[in-house]
């Protein structure tokens, strides 16, 4: 199934065609007007340099006017083998279609709302017939049934015509296009970008990134520049200042040689206040019971830190280098996405 972009926004057109596999671009005078385009010919020539196939409007009230407009645009320097002229369905439109096809042009008969209209376009040799699914559904019609009938007519009678599913409003419409077997679908960029999205895919991808990170990055890579330490001769108030300034929930208590001898956490503070009241912040850290904190060397992989956190059932490890405290690693540091 051919995949076209439906747009006149030059920036998103450039972005979309970086995908490298889109068939082409469909656009309309309405799109151009919406984006403030006044130099239609200049825009057409610019777009023709970007996209593999360009589908543009050839408007006129009579077959002669439609043919003349297609010839005028062709004379701008467009590649006839890479340009499709869009014509609204009408008696004059299908008459112009036949003449243009005989002259070697490709034609898209669009604004199709009935099978009878599609039949006239196919009979006229239209390269594309384009039912507008979203608009039809807005009016309460069985748009998918119409598209299915158009596909079946092409297949049954052997018309050299591709059915284009257009007026796409959501990702479900693209699924519908695949299910009914259309030859072509044209999709707005905001919807096309959603076609690869899935919640479970994102969960799996995040896990892959997380686990790869654990096996390839060292603990030192994630601890940052802040090193929340206080010496043992300081007070609880001093420890709180360090915790607050660094945005941490804990500080490492070190001796004079920067070796870790304990850890003080916001949880410890809450327990002390609950037990002894607010005056505890003036206490010296040496007055508190201390035990050697669990540490990991900065050169170790995050995988090792994760294993320690699980084994010891703690949320934070002191990070050391040659036995000296250089930072902290928290369980949240291990699940940050790359």
Feature map (PLM): residue ranges:
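Active-site beta->alpha loop and helix N-cap motifs at the rims of alpha/beta catalytic domains
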Residues: 2-14, 19-22, 27-34, 38-99, ...
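Alpha-helix-loop-beta-strand connector modules within alpha/beta enzyme cores
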Residues: 44-55, 94-105, 143-163, 209-212
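Short hydrophobic beta-strand motif reused across regulatory alpha/beta modules
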Residues: 262-267, 315, 320, 326-334
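Conserved, mostly hydrophobic/aromatic
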Residues: 28, 85, 121, 177, ...
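Glycine-rich phosphate-binding active-site loops on the catalytic face of alpha/beta enzymes
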Residues: 29-32, 111, 128-139, 181-201
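The conserved cystathionine-beta-synthase
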Residues: 230-247, 254, 273, 294-315, ...
